[in-house]
Regions:
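Long, contiguous binding/interaction regions
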Residues: 1-181
Length: 181
């Protein structure tokens, strides 16, 4: 019903509440423009390795342009989900997964990063499952991404989600990960 609008309304129906194995409650929800500070703080607190694995460069924080692009999204053509928990009545971002629809309109490219201290607790798995479900529901047929060959935790996660992992033809320091939705 909103296809005629330039900016689609916030997809409140995509908000999901879940619990980690350690009993901590988290919310997975689409990012909002007002999450800019949350996203910037999250990125700043990532280790240099996590930043490098996510951005494939050694950034310290998001530029204003990146922050705008990452938080003011067009929910029709892309999606960004954040995992948050409450800490003393403030939201804390634990991870973010996003996709952007490719020009072919049938596939999308994804990115994922989870805060260092929250890795190996199922957050990346939950974010990716939710993201893949949204992409599938929107008629996308394929999700793909690039992962550095030495990012073993991410490659393990991709395999556990049944992504095909293959060497990147032009660069052996990168693996291509693909799944048919």
């Amino acid at each position: 019903p909103y296809h005629h609008l330039a900016i689609h309304p916030y997809p409140v129906n995509l908000v999901a509440r879940t619990q980690l194995p350690n009993g901590i409650n988290i919310v997975i929800r689409p990012i909002r423009p007002e999450d800019a500070d949350l996203e910037q703080n999250f990125t700043r607190q990532l280790s240099n390795e996590a930043k490098y694995f996510r951005f494939m460069s050694s950034i310290q924080e998001l530029t204003p342009e990146m922050l705008t692009r990452f938080t003011q999204i067009d929910y029709h053509n892309e999606m960004a989900l954040i995992a948050v928990t409450e800490d003393q009545h403030h939201e804390v971002e634990l991870g973010v997964a996003r996709y952007v629809i490719n020009p072919d309109k049938r596939s999308c490219e994804f990115a994922l990063v989870v805060a260092d201290e929250w890795q190996r607790q199922g957050i990346g798995h939950k974010l990716m499952n939710h993201l893949m479900g949204i992409a599938r529901d929107r008629g996308l047929e394929r999700m793909e991404g690039e992962v550095l060959s030495n990012n073993f935790k991410m490659l393990d996660l991709m395999k556990s989600l049944y992504f095909q992992v293959t060497p990147y033809p032009e660069d052996n320091s990168i693996k291509q990960v693909v799944i048919d939705l």
